[in-house]
């Protein structure tokens, strides 16, 4: 039976979006569901199902040979897949039941069963959870790259060269793209500009696979010199001084590892979980959520909720 790839892709894409919303678009919870939450096994399943439907392979190696992913992406996908299945099997053995939630009570014994040792000031369970969050982030990044690449390859819409929107960037409908794959390599200052552009243009919410992949490969470009570059610091100030979309921009920067490269102190808390019941998310997620709530108080439509907070945040001292 012939499968309508476009309909199948759309159905799976919507299914994934709805599932992510159910888990509040986050895998960085105290007790993440390693199968259903964003960055979990189901996100890998979605990729394989769509790739198989597109006749692009049944394994990551086959997909690599078809040219849709790079060798590094293939190796990472194999690694995170193996890691998640190993974690899930040990969870089932430890609980003696079908359990896909990394519940608080089993995190410490699970870490010991996996042979994970703690470090100074960190329990084995905290080390294990940070490994999980890093893998979940990697899966989320690769999921975005591959799904967008499939959409672009098999879309029946006429190919768009893109309308120049800023030096190095083009607009393709509601998608932000790059003029060439090496835009960031030639000028690493463009990395932060990608987030500034989307903050200022909420009508361009999507990124092209070329832009996704360029961000994924940009880590080696974001060194100490890059972080201390006055141009990059100025661009970052423009982002956090924006009237709208600041939290979303910071969330995206964190998702692609840019925020931690720009702010080394922030990088140390990425994926860091405290082994107690008082913290529902990782430290980096708590920090970003705090910023989100503070930003909400600056919007007049939210002033009725906590008027004192709004007054304090919007207060400007009188001129002397």
Question: For each predicted feature, which ranges?
Answer:
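Alpha-helical phosphate/pyrophosphate-handling elements in metalloenzyme active cores
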Residues: 50-63, 278-314
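Conserved small/polar residues in nucleotide/adenosyl-binding loops
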Residues: 315-320
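Non-catalytic interface/linker regions that flank or bridge core catalytic/transmembrane domains
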Residues: 1-279
């Amino acid at each position: 039976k012939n499968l309508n790839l476009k309909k199948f892709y759309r159905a799976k894409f919507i299914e994934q979006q709805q599932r992510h919303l159910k888990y509040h678009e986050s895998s960085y919870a105290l007790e993440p569901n390693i199968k259903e939450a964003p960055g979990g096994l189901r996100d890998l399943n979605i990729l394989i199902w769509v790739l198989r439907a597109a006749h692009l392979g049944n394994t990551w190696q086959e997909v690599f040979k078809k040219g849709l992913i790079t060798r590094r992406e293939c190796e990472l996908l194999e690694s995170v897949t193996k890691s998640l299945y190993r974690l899930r099997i040990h969870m089932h053995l430890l609980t003696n039941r079908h359990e896909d939630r990394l519940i608080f009570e089993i995190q410490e014994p699970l870490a010991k069963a996996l042979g994970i040792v703690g470090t100074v000031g960190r329990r084995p369970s905290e080390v294990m959870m940070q490994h999980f969050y890093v893998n979940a982030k990697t899966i989320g990044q690769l999921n975005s790259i591959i799904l967008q690449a499939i959409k672009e390859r098999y879309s029946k819409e006429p190919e768009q060269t893109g309308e120049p929107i800023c030096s190095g960037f083009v607009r393709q409908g509601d998608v932000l793209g790059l003029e060439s794959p090496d835009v960031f390599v030639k000028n690493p200052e463009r990395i932060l500009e990608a987030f500034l552009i989307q903050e200022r243009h909420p009508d361009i919410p999507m990124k092209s696979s070329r832009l996704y992949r360029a961000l994924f490969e940009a880590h080696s470009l974001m060194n100490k010199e890059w972080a201390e570059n006055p141009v990059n610091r100025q661009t970052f100030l423009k982002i956090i001084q924006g009237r709208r979309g600041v939290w979303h921009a910071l969330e995206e920067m964190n998702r692609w590892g840019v925020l931690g490269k720009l702010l080394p102190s922030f990088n140390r808390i990425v994926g860091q979980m405290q082994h107690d019941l008082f913290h529902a998310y990782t430290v980096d997620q708590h920090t970003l959520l705090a910023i989100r709530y503070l930003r909400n108080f600056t919007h007049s439509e939210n002033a009725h909720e906590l008027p004192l907070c709004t007054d304090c945040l919007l207060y400007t001292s009188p001129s002397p």
